[in-house]
Amino acid sequence: MPNARDGLASLLLIAIAAATAAPGHAAPKGAQAERPAEVATRGQREAKDISYGGWQKLCFKAGGAPTLCRTSITGQFATGQTAVRVDLIEREDAAAARLQLFVPVGMYLQQSPRLSVDQGAPFRLPYTWCLTNLCIAADVAAPKIIREMESGKTLTLELVDSNLLAMTTTIPLAQFATVRKGTPARTLEQDIDE
């Protein structure tokens, strides 16, 4: 004869199954559209102490695998610490590219980085993971975003730190299209003997 505990266990299993099967919980594909913030920022400041190098294209070829290329720019603080790195990662046999950001730890992770090209429509990249010295935000880059980056002058990045202050930095895009479409600065190859 079933007891009350068995009935509760059955109800709990049904509730868990219904919650996991509920529609609308899937993560969106591609860079996320602008949504209102859950928590308002307490102020804003511009990160002026970041100096950017030039865009650089590196490619990686391992054995018989398709070539993977990364077009990147790195911004550093005066101390030499990486402040931000932007990567566009493309594989020769894939139609989609991946836009990826490296930012210092200490950001408010519930508010994804916000980017815009030349004050255009903003888009967000969700944080994917954090390491001891940096956090990574990344997603599939819509072709429209790549076209805007190729024709744009600046990419504005807004991050929210753990004090809920919005910090902005402006990343130059003048060389981006030329470097992305050009010959890689380096191609790293790995031969695999079988």
Would you name each region that the model predicts?
Residues 17-25:
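C-terminal segment of classical bacterial N-terminal signal peptides
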Residues 2-4, 25-194:
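A generic "folded-domain core" signal
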